[in-house]
Regions:
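Extended hydrophobic blocks
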Residues: 1-195, 296-302, 306-377
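A structural signal for short, hydrophobic/glycine-enriched beta-strand patches
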Residues: 169, 183-341
Length: 377
């Protein structure tokens, strides 16, 4: 259809704009419906991020074509076929421009929180991930704007220059959509709350103090699990069994499970109500080994897991991988700690789904390459 517009077929311009408006509007509705369904069926999924992130982008396209179609029907002579094609071709750049205020605010927040994190926690590579991401986000926008400015000053862009800019914009579009989708999924997952009918409460371990006692971060997870257990006991009268999960690091005097078990005992939880999993060295093993213990006690028990707010979504993904049906809850952390930790989780999420992302990026690259060549034919 776009090729027929390019050939100048009479009457096709208005109707193609209308078809594109309807098409993109339907895609937005389908993506939003899929996102809502995903929240009910399986919140902890890469698809949750994808559906929301790209729904916003397609919504911007649908809105643009609503505007074009309305004015095209009002004054057909004022519109040319190039506007329809170039709206699609420059959609990635236009979306970056539309979301630039959000990106600027997001990057500034990451930068400030990282500076505070370094002041409190010291300089380590993992503590500057937010600064690196902030720089990349701003640098991408500046680079694309510079290339467009250069073309405006020195004349029309060549096919290959335009292709390079559009592919760069498409690359940034993808990761921007994933950042937005990931941020929304993280917030929803962190605010999620399990029903007060759980049989098992898994508490995910993390680094201990030098003396082997829980750090404030780990105490936050333990206290949240205790609060939930007490609230459930009061509301439904149902007692839950704690599963403390975490092995022993090379620099730790005891396993994280042993440290958590001692803390729960100090809070008055009976020894027989605590199951210890002390072999795991990562989140996936936390879930796998905890599931083994739970299945040995009671098959198909209702499970909740407790971690820190920034880690709930990715921990939920690991639970899905382990075949564990569980609802996650997140303990609060210091304001300057969450953004950088969320970036670390985001990077981890991307590296774990390389094949799926490669397919999506390749598809996006093919689409924008085809549109670029079409615009120059």
């Amino acid at each position: 259809m776009l090729y027929l517009i390019k050939l100048g077929k009479p009457g096709w311009l208005m109707w193609t704009n209308l078809v594109l408006t309807v098409y993109f509007s339907l895609v937005v509705c389908l993506l939003w419906r899929a996102f809502r369904l995903q929240l009910k069926v399986n919140l902890y999924s890469y698809d949750t991020i994808f559906y929301f992130g790209f729904a916003l982008f397609i919504l911007s396209l649908a809105g643009t074509y609503v505007y074009i179609t309305f004015h095209c029907f009002q004054n057909p002579q004022s519109f040319r076929e190039a506007q329809t094609i170039y709206t699609l071709l420059h959609s990635a750049k236009n979306y970056m421009l539309l979301t630039a205020p959000f990106l600027l605010l997001f990057a500034a927040s990451l930068f400030i929180s990282n500076i505070m994190l370094i002041r409190h926690e010291g300089f380590r590579f993992v503590n500057v991930l937010g600064i690196i991401l902030s720089f990349l986000l701003i640098a991408g926008q500046v680079l694309i704007d510079f290339l467009d400015y250069r073309a405006a000053v020195y004349g029309q862009q060549s096919l290959w220059e335009n292709l390079l800019i559009n592919l760069l914009a498409a690359f940034y579009l993808y990761f921007e959509c994933m950042i937005i989708g990931s941020a929304v999924a993280d917030v929803i997952a962190a605010k999620n709350e399990a029903e007060k009918d759980r049989d098992f409460l898994i508490i995910l371990g993390c680094a201990l103090k030098k003396d082997g006692t829980p750090t404030p971060l780990l105490r936050g997870r333990l206290d949240l699990a205790l609060q939930f257990r007490n609230a459930q006991l009061e509301e439904s009268g149902k007692e839950a069994c704690f599963v403390v999960s975490g092995g022993q690091g090379a620099d730790e005097v005891q396993s994280e499970a042993a440290s958590m078990q001692a803390y729960l005992l100090e809070q008055g939880i009976p020894h027989g109500q605590i199951l210890a999993e002390n072999r795991s060295v990562n989140t996936l093993e936390n879930m796998l080994f905890s599931k083994e213990i739970i299945d040995g006690v009671r098959k198909n028990g209702k499970v909740a897991f407790f971690t820190t707010n920034y880690h709930v979504f990715r921990a939920g993904l690991k639970a899905e991988q382990a075949g564990l049906d569980a609802v996650g809850m997140g303990a609060p952390t210091k304001w300057y700690f969450w953004p950088n930790a969320a970036v670390r989780e985001y990077v981890g999420l991307l590296t774990e789904h390389r094949r799926k992302q490669a397919i999506i990026l390749f598809t996006v690259a093919v689409i924008y390459s085809a549109l670029t060549f079409l615009a120059y034919t």
